[in-house]
Amino acid sequence: MNIINAGYEFMTHIDGNEVLEKIEQAGRVCYKSEDLITEDSAKKFCENIIKRGHEAVLEHYSFTVKFIVDRGVSHEIVRHRVASYCQESTRYCNYSKDKFSSEITVIRPSFWRDNIESNDEYVKFAIWERSMCDAETAYFELLEHGATPQEARSVLPNSLKTEVVMTANVREWRHFLRLRTSPAAHPQIREVAIPLLKELQEKVPILFDDIEVE
């Protein structure tokens, strides 16, 4: 069994200036003010669009992110309906095969430490780890007895690693990040959403600056 940390990666190259320029080009059609486009007008235009709440304009730019998370977190991600998804399938992936190193991969819980010096947390982590091993054993035994992957997956845990590719427009990403960086969100989705937000704030001026993490 392999234990890894949750993470994400961009599948779209993001040029912040290009993003703003494309949004400005689309948005100025509304006002027929294309003649006001200059080399440095996009930033101010997008700032005003957000202040006015005219966020439909932000739908003219989309980008793609691949999340590496557990199955539980993936169910929260795909609830965002204004997006397109591809996800690793436990129906078709047979984790006994060599390309999976003949083992299941699970996501390390962010809320329990595998540090023996923190006794209470370590006990919880040890119980979790034991249950993951038991699930892996049961899964492989079912396969050995002729079960198909889609049948054997019924014993796989919520902590099983999955990869979810999400493509959404800027408006939906803003909505996603507002919800999933909130203190009310699940700790393990915040684990990927907060660094994603911070990276986007560095890559793209204006568009995500008003989203604050508590």
Where are the predicted features?
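Family-specific signature for flavin-dependent thymidylate synthase
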Residues: M1-E214
